[in-house]
């Protein structure tokens, strides 16, 4: 009773929502464009091009004819992606992850002309600061601009746990997602532990199963419990985690977001792939019933792994016949260089501000 009352108080007088589970086939969209709002790399003079049916648009400097530039895109070790999808006359927009700092996120979405008032959903892939650090500032900057009761999708209560970074070469406090800020912004916190629809165009994978050779590294630990409203409620965690003070992060709460593109297959936004990019793809396939993968974009979390492991991942991606592979964030230079040699026609380069437009067959 006390727990329920506390949750109701923190979440605007109602219990957290449950996402709409997938019943039958997933929606099919005619077009989806993915804009990298925040990432680690920037190259202002990269030339746009078309690779097969994929239109690649780089932002450049955003120059105008009448006045000199006063700012530019900000890159940092964080990730945020904006997705716009079309199905017939319908258009849907979502923002997945929020970068490391609000300065980068708010600056970049302004320059990239991403309109927060048009967002139909927010998705947080997992509870690491480099994916939610810009959220509070984004919500404060756009107070009153977002749609009423805007859904905020998460993969479970673990998203709210306070974390310590323990992976070399650094250690320290890695922050916590503040649920009270979400309540103040009048977001509808929506738990999507299982495969779920997002904005009736996209779907989340739900929690990602371990279906391949891939290993889960644990660069962070989770503190179990709530202190002054910050943290995760033990009652909402898996049974084996409830009585522990701190536990290695296994990222059971991590999820990916995907689209079923007409006549092409899945376009999968992986975020960070702590549970493996191959496992993430397999989870999206299982969630949707669609086996063909047109593109996978996001962090693949291969930077910490040895070359042999990276090669094994590339071999698996080739075996799965993914049309296009777009590494971001934590994928690592070793992966990029090896993939460039092993699958040069499938590997696409991205920078902060790059937009990938995927057209359905027959468009």
List each model region and its residues:
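Zn-dependent metallo-beta-lactamase
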Residues: 3-90, 204-253, 261
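Divalent metal-coordination and catalytic microenvironments
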Residues: 83, 97, 109, 126, ...
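Cap/insert and terminal regions of metallo-dependent hydrolase folds
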Residues: 121, 128-132, 151, 236-356
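Pre-active-site segment of Zn-dependent metallo-hydrolases
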Residues: 68-77, 85-121, 136-137, 144, ...
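Short hydrophobic-aromatic micro-motifs
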Residues: 96, 198-207, 267-270
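Short acidic low-complexity segments
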Residues: 115, 189-198
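Short, well-ordered beta-strand micro-motif
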Residues: 82-84, 197, 258-260, 357
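Active-site HxH/HxHxD metal-binding segment of metal-dependent hydrolases
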Residues: 120, 125-193, 206-217, 318-324
């Amino acid at each position: 009773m006390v727990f329920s009352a506390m949750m109701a108080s923190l979440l605007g007088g109602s219990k957290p929502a449950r996402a709409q589970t997938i019943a039958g086939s997933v929606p099919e969209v005619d077009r989806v464009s993915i804009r990298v709002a925040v990432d680690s790399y920037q190259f202002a003079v990269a030339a746009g091009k078309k690779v097969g049916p994929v239109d690649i648009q780089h932002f450049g400097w955003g120059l105008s004819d009448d006045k000199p530039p006063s700012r530019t895109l900000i890159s940092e070790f964080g990730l945020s992606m904006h997705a716009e999808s079309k199905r017939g006359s319908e258009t849907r927009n979502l923002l997945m992850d929020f970068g490391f700092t609000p300065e980068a996120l708010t600056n970049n979405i302004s320059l990239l002309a991403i309109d927060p008032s048009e967002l139909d959903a927010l998705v947080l892939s997992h509870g690491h600061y480099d994916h939610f650090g810009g959220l509070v500032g984004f919500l404060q900057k756009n107070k009153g601009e977002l749609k009423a009761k805007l859904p905020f999708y998460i993969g479970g209560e673990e998203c709210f746990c306070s974390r310590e970074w323990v992976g070399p070469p650094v250690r320290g406090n890695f922050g916590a997602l503040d649920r009270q800020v979400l309540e103040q912004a009048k977001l509808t916190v929506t738990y999507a532990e299982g495969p779920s629809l997002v904005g009736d165009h996209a779907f989340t994978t739900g929690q990602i199963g371990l279906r391949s050779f891939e290993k889960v590294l644990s660069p962070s630990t989770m503190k179990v419990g709530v202190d002054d409203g910050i943290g995760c409620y033990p009652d909402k965690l898996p049974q084996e985690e409830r009585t522990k003070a701190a536990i290695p992060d296994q990222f059971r709460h991590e999820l990916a977001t995907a689209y079923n593109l007409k006549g092409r297959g899945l376009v999968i936004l992986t975020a960070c792939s702590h549970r493996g990019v191959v496992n993430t793809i397999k989870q999206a396939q299982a969630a949707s019933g669609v086996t063909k993968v047109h593109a996978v974009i996001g962090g693949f979390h291969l930077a910490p792994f040895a070359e042999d492991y990276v090669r094994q991942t590339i071999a698996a991606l080739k075996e799965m016949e993914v049309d296009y592979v777009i590494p971001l964030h934590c994928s690592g230079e070793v992966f990029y260089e090896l993939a460039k040699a092993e699958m040069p026609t499938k590997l696409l380069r991205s920078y902060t501000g790059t937009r990938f437009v995927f057209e359905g067959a027959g468009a």
